[in-house]
Amino acid sequence: MQAKTAMMAAVALLAVGGLAPLAAKQTAVDYSAALASSERPGDDTVRDADRQPAAILAFAGVKPGSRIVELAPGGGYYTRILSLAVGPNGRIYTRTSRLGQAVATWAATHGNTSPGVVTAASASLAPEPVDIVWTTLNYHDFKIIKVEGGDFAIVANRLAFAALKPGGVYLVNDHDGAKGTGTSQTDTLHRIEMAGVIAEVEAAGFKLDAQSDVLRHPGDDHTTRVTETGIRGKTDQFVLRFRKPAKRR
């Protein structure tokens, strides 16, 4: 199991190497120990081949000691990986509309993980500036949640920008929609067109730094609900790395 995980991690680093020039300048981080940890449930590890977590962590620049806000952690698949990857000197702040049991259970035995609630009225995402704000397969859901003045995606982008250190990373991964569909399928197929996400996040002050094709699936025609048998785990997904502009000297 450990040998297989190490091989997946090495392949993942090669997979993103040509897509993320800034990441290539950084010292490569070995995520194999985190991914092979016996603390991860079996239901998580069987999903690794589809979700390519080592590649996504490398693309985002996750490393020991990183401070990360994870928006909408769901069942905690990435919460557990991120917590193990950043180690005892790092910090994971999970933020969602309601606290989930899976994340709460993990946090109870892992002091580097701090669950919390975020709403449209929240003033901040974390008690300190963070290196990365992370959301996977949730941005389309943010568009469904309506708040005063628009939808929760606008709130999430604003809070993410405020939470990040200058030069920090906003990692957005979601199921892509067909060209021209925009946000029309967020509540039906649970897809969102990448072009609109880029425009919206950049309007919040971010700059698109790079995108990874590691979760691209050309065989997905973008017409099927993402939870349908046969497509689940094999959807065509975009992975975008935005940066908060660094302060000018």
Q: Can you name each region flagged by the protein language model?
A:
Residues 221-249:
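Core SAM-dependent methyltransferase catalytic element
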Residues 64-65, 88-89, 164-170:
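Short glycine-dipeptide loop
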Residues 83-84, 148-166:
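A short glycine-rich, Lys/Arg-flanked "PGG" loop and its adjoining helix->strand segment in the class I
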Residues 124-137:
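A short acidic, Gly/Pro-enriched loop at the edge of an enzyme's catalytic core
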Residues 31-59, 63:
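Class I SAM-dependent methyltransferase Rossmann-like catalytic core
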Residues 101-127:
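S-adenosyl-L-methionine
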Residues 64-74:
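Conserved class I S-adenosyl-L-methionine
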Residues 182-209:
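Conserved Class I S-adenosyl-L-methionine
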